[in-house]
Amino acid sequence: MGSFDDPFRVGAELITEAKKETDHILIDFHAEVTSEKMAAGWYFDGRASAVVGTHTHVQTNDARILEKGTAFQTDVGMTGFYNGILGMSKESILENFTTQMPTRFTTPDTGEGQLNAVLIETDDKTGRAKNIQTIRIDGDTFFMD
């Protein structure tokens, strides 16, 4: 595996470039560790309209506007199969854990889906976040904070 650059430094450079075109900047911070995602939120606070984490497939309940106007949520969640694990069939994931052998994760052909998202409203002039709402649809059940 090759070396990777510092996402905080690179993100700051990309924001500088993007600001030449728009003040509305969304950062999808793809990481495993919640503390790294939170650090990104605070680091980019006031420079990005929103910082939302992805990767864990589990929607967090911490949507908020940070001190300098950046919308933040540790993890948006996922879109996938509802009655499974990480959007996959529970049987394939359980087989992986119980046999400790590599297993191909599968998705069912039918079944209820799940959609996780956030709705972010920004100020037209400044690009700062005015509101962030969590959206979750599980089968026929709709939740919105």
Summary of predicted features, one role per range:
Residues L94-D145:
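A short C-terminal boundary segment appended to hydrolase-like catalytic domains
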Residues T34-F105:
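Conserved beta-sheet core of the metallophosphoesterase superfamily
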Residues M1-H24:
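Binuclear metal-dependent hydrolase catalytic cores centered on His/Asp/Glu-rich metal-binding motifs
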Residues G2-V10, A39, S92, E112-L115, ...:
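Conserved active-site and cofactor/substrate-binding residues in soluble primary-metabolism enzymes
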Residues F29-A31, R136:
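Short, structured patches in soluble enzyme cores that scaffold and shape functional sites
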Residues K20-F29, R47-V51:
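Short beta-strand/loop segments at the ligand-binding rim of alpha/beta enzyme cores
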Residues M1-G2, V33-S35:
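Short, small-residue-enriched loops and turns at beta-alpha junctions
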Residues L26, H55, I120:
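Divalent metal-coordination and catalytic microenvironments
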